[in-house]
Amino acid sequence: KSTTLAGMIDYLNNTFEGHILTIEDPVEFVHKSKKCLVNQRELGVHTLSFANALRAALREDPDIILVGEMRDLDTIQLALTAAETGHLVFATLHTSSAPKTIDRIIDAFPPNQQAQVRAQLSETLEAVLTQTLLKKRSGGRVAAVEIMVGTTAVRNLIREGKLHQIPGI
């Protein structure tokens, strides 16, 4: 997961002009500014929590935000707010499938907020990428990747709370 995110950040840094802000625990790959200004924040060094760093990030107005891990409700809520306000947000969450990722985000919120969160996700979600390492018969491991793109159909199912239908699309 770290290598995949580092590759995505490197691609954006080489391809687009803008401001990239990463919030990580720990910083695993150091990104030098190329076409983008890259600022990297590390938990325990530059900030006390992902949520605190995200609050500060929204004042810095980055174009792209990488959240190393969405561990709590506050962080998830702030990541959604950042996406709603036009930031491209990359974040990690430990789940086993794309629909379960959406479930986990929604379930982090109290029941009375879940309809609103489904609406937010349906408006902002671009994609979910799920990775797992599978054992090879010959030894070693190989990456298996699931990609769910935020198509109109996927967005509608998220909004309507019909996540169980996503694998059928």
Please give the residue ranges for each predicted region.
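Short, flexible helix-loop junctions that flank or precede catalytic/ligand sites
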Residues: 1-169
